[in-house]
Amino acid sequence: MEEAESQAVEKSEGYPLVLTVVVPARNEEDSIGACLESLVRQSEAGWELGREWEIVVVNDDSTDRTREIAAGFAGVTVLDAGEPEPGWTGKANAIQTGVRAARGRWLLFTDADTVHEPGHLSLAITEAERHEVGMLSYSPRQVVTGLVQRALMPLIFSELAVLYSPAKVNNPEHRMAAANGQFLLVRRDAYEKVGGHAAVMDAVLEDVALARIFKRRKLGLRFRYAPEAVSTRMYRSVGAMWQGWRKNLALLFGNPLTLAVWRVLDLVLLVGLPFAAWWVWEVARYGKGAYWTHYYGLVVLLIWVRTLWRFYRRVGRSHFPWGDVLLAPLGLPLFAALLYQSWFDHTVKKQVVWKGREYSGMKR
């Protein structure tokens, strides 16, 4: 980090530190160690942990070794959130607990499954100040393992990239707002002006809900893909991935059933068109008018190639490696099923489950 960049991040009157990093954590023993190690490594001359900035981990009633692991890091403050009050989600309650103890002019809310590259905390503040925004959110590089995750996750993130494109989100005149709670940096005065997480206490997607308030209040919002700054492994099992997206998809996409139908149509075309071309060629071999019928099969094949190209062009926007993108057709039936289940939970059952807690009648 250059000296000029360090000097650009200054303390402000009223808060003794530049930044407080708040890490809400519930049963994150598999990931919180790597997260905190990457955060502690940010400390360097001119940007020293405990002098310019701090880390606050909020243990959200974990039943594993999350608290013990966090407490083992020197310079890290560990708090206990306790059970949330009625009407509060666990994550919003944990973040609010951390904010009450925070001493920074800027607040970074980041998940316990993230890994941060050296030097990028102060650079993020510099970026937010340069763009004069009250909220800066990064979409991390996603780390996935196993066939199911590799086939499904690019589909989800490509849809998110199309719907919540940074060009729309970063345009103050456009109504679209988005943020990613895995890395959400806010200027404290702007955050307090909107009421903090108390304003989104019952929102299942509190990050997007908070971004919408910031944009509506014209406090400045910037959102972008930032693989150079942060990465995350969101899910360590297929079950956890299924439960997580089941909670979120119906909230992220306005018409999940319509989207499910379109993805099923993708599957039908990708699989069906080659068989249709083969069938036409078989008819051409044995039927009358074989010479002309042969070209009909070629037309069908060209339509399939065009469909395949458009499909991969769309999924390529997910920022996943092409090895994962190529597997995306295998994930289409799973994506459609997940969209349906998420719609059913939110619309019919009106209840979602996450990290052992049930939420009913919560805001979108």
Region annotations inferred by a language model:
Residues 80-100, 123-193, 198, 249, ...:
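Long helical/loop segments within the catalytic core of UDP-sugar-dependent glycosyltransferases
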Residues 38, 59-68, 83:
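A conserved acidic beta->alpha catalytic loop
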Residues 17-20, 54:
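Cell-envelope/extracellular polymer assembly enzymes that use nucleotide-activated donors
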Residues 30-34, 63-72, 119:
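Acidic helix N-cap motif at the loop->helix transition within catalytic regions
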Residues 65, 112-127:
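Acidic donor-binding/catalytic loop of UDP-sugar-dependent glycosyltransferases
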Residues 263-349:
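Membrane-embedded multi-pass helical conduit in multi-pass membrane proteins
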Residues 37-52:
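Short, acidic, metal-binding catalytic loop of nucleotide-sugar glycosyltransferases
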Residues 128, 135-161, 189-192, 197-259, ...:
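Catalytic donor/gating beta->alpha subdomain of glycosyltransferases that bind UDP-sugars
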